[in-house]
């Protein structure tokens, strides 16, 4: 196997220490480990004797695989397309040659015509008499599939050429249970389409990653994923009782059972954006409302922010007009970080750098929460307290301004009118936050609203040997 170090990984102390991964992990390397790291940096094949270290690098997100062709091809894949009141033909036409295609019509108002499928062995059109939701539709499709790999592709998605081949190589690792592509919004002339090209909740960006809770890539959307059938069956498949958030739930259950899940942005699937402001608001509200149901199944993992008290104190001091005190509070953890780092010439500098990065990220989380999940509290505080009003307004305005400026660097068709961007950003954030509060009240679960401290939740992934049936 060939792998590459994560872009954030840093070799220190003459190569004897490696920092990287999400969450951050420190590796102390002996001579053998240093030779393995040298081979990784040179792009060489990693010998079998080094696979224990390689597993640790992959499981912490410190390194990422560079798979070859792998044991599977497109004929080993059944594509399952759940449909409800949509035209699946653009999706089906973009799939190319695969083992089989199964369309599940989840009680569309106008039934999907049988002629949408290119009839070949294994192709099927299945129907639900009543609407049961996308998770149930995917389960129906899975029950009819016989191939070792399953691709779930929503009917509002159009895969780019070569998307499947870019994902299949990852399954040469028998512990990989799921791989997801980059899901980008289709560019269009409308304000919503332009906004979604920059801020789609399905677009996780251009940087690959391991997928696991409490990491940089905490989930992937089920709009398009390829799953090992044995892995899906080992956790009971998608939960049909969840109409939203079922993809997050599945990924977290797979990881909990020891399966590796990967995000591979070299594979691209395009997604049609919502056509109206009301539809966008309903979508974001639904996403927010699913957080409490996920908190019931995975307590502590959906907290809107993970914050240390010192970081909150530091940013509170800055907001109150005491920037020096706030900065000192923000850098205070450098003392404890220094003790945790191994003795090396760069220890002091790295401790300060890590403390500063942690403080900045805490500020980003606070700003996001104040305008998204905590906006009812922030709005109330701005009316009650004049002193709080100015920093809260700045907290709301600065991210919006930065977001709009970023649209200027994109293609011409993605650039937003500033007023349209502000309105859409407000609808996006307020709808999501309202959904979180509605779900928390309905489920009586405050975990989707309250922040937590690092380390308060332990998410353990069971070490796993490839199960029978995982191999080709």
Residue positions per predicted region:
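Short, well-formed alpha-helical segments that are part of the catalytic scaffolds
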Residues: 83-99
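Acidic donor-binding/catalytic loop of UDP-sugar-dependent glycosyltransferases
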Residues: 89, 110-111, 157-170
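Glycine-rich, basic loop-to-helix element that forms the pyrophosphate-binding segment
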Residues: 127-145, 155, 209-218
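Short aromatic/hydrophobic "clamp" motif used to bind/position activated sugar donors
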Residues: 150
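Conserved donor NDP-sugar-binding/catalytic core segment of glycosyltransferases
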Residues: 161-194, 272
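Short, flexible, basic/aromatic active-site loop/helix in glycosyltransferases
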Residues: 181, 196-217
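Acidic donor-binding loop at a coil-to-helix junction in glycosyltransferase catalytic cores
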Residues: 244-250, 283
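Active-site-adjacent helix/loop segment of glycosyltransferases
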Residues: 264-265, 270-329, 338-437, 451
């Amino acid at each position: 196997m060939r792998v590459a170090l994560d872009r954030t990984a840093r070799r220190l102390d003459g190569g004897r220490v490696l920092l990287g991964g999400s969450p951050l992990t420190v590796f102390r390397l002996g001579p053998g480990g240093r030779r393995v790291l040298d081979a990784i940096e040179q792009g060489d094949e990693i010998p079998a004797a080094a696979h224990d270290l390689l597993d640790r690098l992959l499981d912490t997100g410190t390194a990422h695989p560079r798979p070859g062709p792998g044991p599977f091809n497109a004929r080993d894949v059944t594509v399952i397309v759940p449909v409800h009141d949509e035209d699946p033909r653009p999706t089906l036409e973009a799939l190319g040659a695969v083992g089989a295609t199964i369309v599940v019509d989840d009680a569309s108002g106008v039934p999907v015509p049988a002629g949408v499928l290119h009839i070949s062995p294994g192709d099927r059109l299945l129907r639900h008499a009543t609407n049961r939701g996308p998770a149930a539709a995917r389960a129906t499709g899975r029950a009819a599939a016989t191939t070792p790999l399953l691709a779930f592709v929503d009917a509002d998605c159009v895969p780019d050429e070569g998307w499947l081949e870019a994902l299949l190589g990852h399954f040469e690792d028998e512990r990989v249970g799921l791989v997801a592509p980059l899901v980008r919004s289709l560019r269009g002339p409308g304000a919503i389409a332009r906004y979604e090209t920059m801020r789609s909740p399905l677009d996780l960006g251009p940087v690959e990653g391991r997928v696991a809770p409490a990491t940089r890539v905490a989930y992937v959307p089920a709009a398009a994923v390829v799953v090992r059938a044995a892995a899906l069956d080992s956790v009971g498949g998608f939960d049909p009782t969840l109409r939203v958030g079922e993809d997050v739930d599945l990924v977290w259950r797979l990881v909990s059972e020891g399966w590796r899940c990967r995000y591979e942005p070299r594979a691209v699937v395009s997604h049609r954006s919502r056509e109206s402001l009301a539809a966008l608001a309903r979508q974001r509200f639904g996403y927010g409302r699913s957080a409490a149901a996920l908190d019931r199944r995975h307590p502590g993992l959906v907290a809107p922010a993970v914050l240390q008290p010192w970081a909150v104190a530091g940013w509170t001091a800055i907001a109150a007009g005491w920037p020096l005190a706030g900065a000192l509070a923000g850098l205070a953890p450098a003392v404890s970080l220094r003790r945790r780092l191994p003795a090396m010439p760069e220890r002091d500098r790295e401790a300060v750098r890590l403390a500063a990065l942690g403080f900045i990220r805490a500020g980003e989380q606070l700003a996001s929460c104040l305008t998204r999940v905590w906006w009812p509290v922030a709005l109330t505080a701005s009316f009650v307290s004049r002193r709080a009003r100015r920093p809260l307004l700045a907290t709301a305005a600065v991210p919006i301004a930065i977001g709009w400026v970023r649209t200027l660097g994109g293609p011409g068709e993605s650039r937003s009118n500033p007023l349209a961007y502000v309105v859409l950003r407000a609808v996006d954030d307020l709808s999501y936050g309202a959904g979180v509060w509605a779900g928390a009240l309905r489920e009586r679960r405050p975990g989707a609203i309250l922040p937590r401290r690092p380390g308060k939740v332990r998410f353990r992934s069971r070490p796993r040997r490839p199960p029978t049936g995982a191999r080709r």
